[in-house]
């Protein structure tokens, strides 16, 4: 699940992605909701198209799918977010209530509560470290002292 509207996840190889704020490289028909990849020639169309993104005050795209993923997750990681905007601000709480281990990864400490672990440092280093820990040990223990990052339990 991503809140980003760019295509960086897709370019990095993510294939099972839910873009809850839409995708900038897609357009949506205002009346029918049809979504097309952009660029798409709509010059001859008499109908109105708009970017396939969520604007303030609009309902999040695919929220039902997001909730299914949150309640089925064994690990929930929030990476590079303030965690202050609803509904994403409740995702860690929802995942944790469903039994997931929750991890916050941010460049600076946020003071967020509700996470089992808070990793402080660059996501480019900490996400691979987290994935490696889960794959090699089957659990999340602590951050690597070799990189100078540490995992702090709430």
Located regions from the model:
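Conserved catalytic alpha/beta core of Sir2/sirtuin-type deacylases, generalized to analogous enzyme cores
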Residues: 1-154
């Amino acid at each position: 699940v991503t809140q980003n509207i760019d295509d960086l996840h897709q370019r990095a190889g993510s294939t099972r992605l839910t873009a809850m704020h839409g995708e900038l490289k897609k357009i949506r028909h205002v009346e029918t909701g049809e979504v097309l990849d952009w660029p798409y020639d709509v010059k001859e169309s008499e109908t109105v198209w708009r970017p396939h993104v969520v604007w303030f005050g609009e309902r999040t795209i695919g929220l039902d799918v997001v909730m299914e993923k949150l309640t089925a997750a064994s690990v929930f990681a929030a990476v590079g977010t303030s965690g202050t905007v609803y509904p994403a601000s409740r995702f860690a709480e929802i995942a944790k209530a469903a039994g997931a281990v929750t991890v916050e990864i941010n460049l600076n400490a946020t003071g967020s509560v509700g996470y089992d672990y808070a990793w402080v440092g660059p996501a480019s280093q900490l996400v691979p470290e987290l994935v490696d820990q889960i794959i090699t040990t089957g659990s999340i223990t602590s951050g690597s002292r070799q990189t100078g990052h540490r995992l702090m339990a709430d």
